[in-house]
Amino acid sequence: MEKIKKQLQIILYVWVWLLSFSMADAAEAITDEYWITTADRGKIEQRYRSLGIYEVAKKTVSRKEEQYGNYTYRVWYPKRLETENRKWPMVFLLNGTTSTCDLDEPIFEHLASWGFIVVGNTDRNTGLGYSAEWGLELMDKLAADRKSVFFQKIDEE
C-alpha cells in the first residue's frame, strides 16, 4: 500500500508540472519540440527544458484488455534499460479530460529522455483513478515477468 501511495504522489507532482505547461499556453497543442519555444526563467526549468541524454524507446504493453479497463497502455523508457542491469524510476501520467497519452507523447518522450520509465494510457476520463490503479498493477506484473523488458527494472523505493 505504501508503494502505491508513493507512486500516486509522483503522479500528482507530475500532473501539477504538466498543468503548468497547459496554463502557460493553453491555446496551442503540444508539439514535438515544445521545449525549444518554452521560455523558462528558473534555473531548474532551464536545466531540464531540453531533452536528456537517453535515447527513448516506446512499447505498447497492453492493448484494450478487459482486466485493465479496455484501455491501451504505453510505456516510454530509456533504451539503455534493455541492456543495463539497474533500476529506473517510474512515472505514471494521467491524462486530462478528453486527452490521451497519444496526444501528449512529446512530454512522455521528454521525461523518458531524462531516465524515467513513463507510463500512459488512452483513458480520456482519469478522474476516478481506475486506469491508474490498473496501470500500476500491469507494471508490477511486468516487473515480475522474466520475459518482460521491465523485469526487475522498476525502482519502487
Annotate each language-model stretch with its function.
Residues 2-11:
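Bacterial N-terminal signal peptides that target proteins for export
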Residues 82-86, 130-157:
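Gly/Ser-rich "nucleophile elbow"/oxyanion-hole loop immediately N-terminal to the catalytic nucleophile
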Residues 11-20:
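Bacterial N-terminal signal peptides
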Residues 86-96:
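Short beta-strand element of the alpha/beta-hydrolase
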Residues 102-120:
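Short amphipathic alpha-helix adjacent to the substrate-entry channel of hydrolases
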Residues 23-26:
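Sec/Tat signal peptide C-region and signal peptidase I cleavage site
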Residues 28-86:
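N-terminal cap/lid segment of alpha/beta-hydrolase-fold proteins
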Residues 81, 96-100, 118, 123-128:
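Solvent-exposed loop/turn segments at secondary-structure junctions
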